[in-house]
Design a protein with these regions (language model features):
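Non-catalytic C-terminal accessory region of glycerolipid acyltransferases
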Residues: 14-131
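Catalytic core of membrane glycerolipid acyltransferases/transacylases, capturing the structured
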Residues: 1-11, 18, 72
Length: 131
């Protein structure tokens, strides 16, 4: 496993080149588009557009994943994986900054949908009675 450091205060092009390097080698690159660990249970952190720009530049889909925050370290990790999103399908021509922001918002909305889906599944499971 490889880690690509990102300096949020002084972001530079070398990060894009490293992401491109690994994607060209069919590696999986996980990006948290909030830019930090999300401490909010209600997913109110906005997504940054860097992940969108990288996916467009490298011509790869984004596969949205929602990971439920655990209250305790011993709890089972719960997550849900969405369908791949091909961002190029949502824009025409050269992407503008408004396109990047709008696509980042769309990804955020998708994560909210995945959270709601997982919450519904877990609620149904909790209602079952075991003997």
């Amino acid at each position: 496993m490889q880690c690509i450091p990102v300096n949020k205060q002084n972001f530079n092009y070398s990060t894009f080149k490293q992401v491109e390097y690994w994607l060209d080698r069919n590696s999986i690159v996980a990006i948290f588009p909030e830019g930090t660990v999300n401490e909010n249970k209600d997913l109110t952190n906005t997504f940054h557009s860097g992940a969108v720009l990288m996916a467009l530049k490298c011509k790869v889909p984004i596969i949205p994943i929602y990971i439920k925050r655990r209250e305790h370290w011993y709890e089972r990790l719960r997550y849900v994986i969405g369908e791949p999103i091909y961002l190029r399908d949502y824009i025409k021509g050269v992407p503008k900054i408004d396109d990047l922001i709008s696509l980042a918002d769309m990804l955020h909305d998708k994560e909210v949908e995945l959270k709601a889906f997982l919450d519904r599944k877990l609620q149904k499971k909790e209602k079952k009675i075991y003997f």
